[in-house]
């Protein structure tokens, strides 16, 4: 039996101006895995995330967290936000304290934890995100990548069960992208945190994500593991997305260069294995 930490049932959300942002969303998020939400700008990803942790309340439908409907009382929402943390795309929208230590400690202080527990959690969060050496530095003096890590640490200090990140790799150089994704996967594996990301960086999805949902105009139109989702090439392209670069290369080799592949490989490792197998078969025949 599948273990889902979040269940979304017929979720609709309307903004006050009449915009119908989410339209009958049904979605199950597996506990302890990395899930990607894909889709163009304006399809409802951010609205969905804000419904997940109670910033917004559904117009209709419901969300279950840990198999219980979300409690929208003040106490219930405060508890929910300790368990489901959001890291925004632009860390400058999330950092507001004078120093890194003060900023990271904010959530723990707000939880009214004992001082020694606050110090312990902050130290652990700083160490986990690799920014212990920055703890006394003013937040406005940090690089963009460092600010991203501080924002993650500020959520991590509350020891959430779910960590939601809106475009976690946006604005980072290639090394920064790799480092931040490895950090997230490390937290998922070692702490058991469920990771949910919205991203336009298609190439990271088959490398780091277990599950994928594709959205269009407020609806989920595809879901599955990366191979299942990217096998729907026509649908992917119709919603202004693309295949991962390796997947596109394998598609070209098959359709234009006579290579024979059973499946569409999406990573370098998968592609090497398939091409070597094909090469050996040709030479042996």
From Swiss-Prot:
SMART domains: AAA (SM00382). Keywords: ATP-binding, Cell membrane, Membrane, Nucleotide-binding, Translocase, Transport. Signal peptide: none annotated. It is found in: Cell membrane. Residues 6-242 form the ABC transporter domain. Its main location: membrane. It is an enzyme of class 7 (translocase). Disulfide bonds: none annotated. InterPro entries: AAA+_ATPase (IPR003593), ABC_transporter-like_ATP-bd (IPR003439), ABC_transporter-like_CS (IPR017871), ABC_transpr_CbiO/EcfA_su (IPR015856), Co_trans_ATP-bd (IPR005876), ECF_ABC_transporter_ATP-bd (IPR050095), P-loop_NTPase (IPR027417). GO terms for biological process: cobalt ion transport. Its EC number is 7.-.-.-. It is a peripheral membrane protein. Forms a stable energy-coupling factor (ECF) transporter complex composed of 2 membrane-embedded substrate-binding proteins (S component), 2 ATP-binding proteins (A component) and 2 transmembrane proteins (T component). Belongs to the ABC transporter superfamily. Energy-coupling factor EcfA family. ATP-binding (A) component of a common energy-coupling factor (ECF) ABC-transporter complex. Unlike classic ABC transporters this ECF transporter provides the energy necessary to transport a number of different substrates. This is Energy-coupling factor transporter ATP-binding protein EcfA3.
């Amino acid at each position: 039996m599948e273990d889902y930490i979040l269940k979304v049932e017929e979720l609709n959300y309307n903004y006050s101006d009449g915009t119908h942002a989410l339209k009958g969303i049904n979605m199950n998020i597996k506990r302890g895995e990395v899930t990607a939400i894909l889709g163009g700008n304006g399809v409802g990803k951010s609205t969905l995330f804000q419904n997940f942790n109670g910033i917004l309340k559904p117009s209709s439908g419901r969300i279950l967290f840990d198999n219980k409907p979300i409690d929208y009382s003040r106490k219930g929402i405060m508890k929910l936000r300790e368990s489901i943390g959001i890291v925004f795309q632009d860390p400058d929208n999330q950092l507001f304290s004078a120093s890194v230590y003060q900023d990271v400690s904010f959530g723990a202080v707000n939880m009214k934890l004992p001082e020694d527990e606050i110090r312990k959690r902050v130290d652990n969060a700083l160490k986990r995100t690799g920014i212990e050496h920055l703890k006394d530095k003013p937040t406005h003096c940090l690089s963009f990548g460092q600010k991203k890590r501080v924002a993650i640490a500020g959520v991590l200090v509350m020891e959430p069960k779910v960590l939601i990140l809106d475009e976690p790799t946006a604005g980072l150089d290639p090394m920064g992208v790799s480092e931040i994704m490895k950090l997230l996967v490390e937290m998922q594996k070692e702490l058991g945190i469920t990771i949910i990301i919205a991203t336009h960086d298609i190439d990271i999805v088959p490398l780091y994500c277990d599950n994928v949902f594709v959205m269009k105009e407020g609806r989920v139109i595809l879901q599955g593991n990366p191979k299942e989702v990217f096998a729907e090439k026509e649908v992917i392209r119709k919603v202004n997305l693309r295949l991962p670069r390796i997947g596109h290369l394998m598609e070209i080799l098959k359709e234009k260069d006579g290579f024979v592949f059973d499946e569409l490989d999406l990573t370098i490792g998968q592609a090497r294995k398939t091409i070597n197998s094909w090469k050996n078969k040709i030479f042996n025949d």
